[in-house]
Amino acid sequence: MAAEPVEDNCINFVAMKFIDNTLYFIAEDDENLESDYFGKLESKLSVIRNLNDQVLFIDQGNRPLFEDMTDSDCRDNAPRTIFIISMYKDSQPRGMAVTISVKCEKISTLSCENKIISFKEMNPPDNIKDTKSDIIFFQRSVPGHDNKMQFESSSYEGYFLACEKERDLFKLILKKEDELGDRSIMFTVQNED
C-alpha cells in the first residue's frame, strides 16, 4: 500500500525588508497565517491545593491565601475556594494557557502585573491579541510527579505561582524557579465539574 502524499504546509516569501534592524519576510499569500494571540476555549471549576494539602481561597481582602480546610469547610466556603480555570488556545506551543478567576460578588481574575500577585476585578477576555499577558499562566504537569501542576507566567518567563509562608499566613506569590524539584511551585488541581 502506497503512502499518501502530504500537502506542503509552507509559506512562499516574495520580499524581505529591514525595519529597525529587524528582518521581515513578506508572504506571497498571508490569508492563512495566524496572528499571535490567546483565544478562550472552555472553563472548569477547580479547587487548588499546595503540596501541604492547604486549599487556596480568597480572603475578605481579596488576597489569595492557603489554609487547612476539610472538604466540608471547602464546600461551605465556596465560592471563595472554587476557582474558574479558563483554558485558551495559544498560537505558540508552551503548555496549556489558562486564566484563574473567582466569582464572589463579582468576577476577579488573577494577575501577576509587575510580578505582584493580585486579583483584578474583571472577566477573563475571550481573546488576548498578544503572546504575553499578566493574566495568562501556562499550566503544565510536573515531570515525575503524578497529578501535580505548575503555573508559569506568560509575562515573566521562568516565574511560577508559588506558596510562601509569611508570618502566620501562607500566600500565593510569583517566584522565580530556583531549583529543580522546587515543591513550593507545585499544586494539585481538583476539577469540581
Curated annotation (Swiss-Prot):
Changing residue 168 to A: Reduces binding to IL18R1 and the ability to induce IFNG production. The keyword Cytoplasm applies. Induction: In macrophages, release is increased by endocannabinoid anandamide/AEA. Changing residue 183 to A: Reduces binding of the preformed binary complex of IL18 and IL18R1 to IL18RAP. Changing residue 12 to A: Strongly decreased processing by CASP4 or CASP5. InterPro entries: IL-18, IL-1_fam, IL1/FGF. It is found in: Cytoplasm, Cytosol; Secreted. GO terms for molecular function: cytokine activity; interleukin-18 receptor binding. The lineage of its organism: Eukaryota, Metazoa, Chordata, Craniata, Vertebrata. Keywords: Cytokine, Cytoplasm, Inflammatory response, Secreted. Belongs to the IL-1 family. Changing residue 36 to A: Abolished processing by CASP1 or CASP4 or CASP5 and maturation. This is Interleukin-18. Pro-inflammatory cytokine primarily involved in epithelial barrier repair, polarized T-helper 1 (Th1) cell and natural killer (NK) cell immune responses. Upon binding to IL18R1 and IL18RAP, forms a signaling ternary complex which activates NF-kappa-B, triggering synthesis of inflammatory mediators. Synergizes with IL12/interleukin-12 to induce IFNG synthesis from T-helper 1 (Th1) cells and natural killer (NK) cells. Changing residue 120 to A: Reduces binding of the preformed binary complex of IL18 and IL18R1 to IL18RAP resulting in impaired IFNG production. Forms a ternary complex with ligand-binding receptor subunit IL18R1 and signaling receptor subunit IL18RAP at the plasma membrane. Mature IL18 first binds to IL18R1 forming a low affinity binary complex, which then interacts with IL18RAP to form a high affinity ternary complex that signals inside the cell. Interacts with cargo receptor TMED10; the interaction mediates the translocation from the cytoplasm into the ERGIC (endoplasmic reticulum-Golgi intermediate compartment) and thereby secretion. GO terms for cellular component: cytosol; extracellular region; extracellular space.
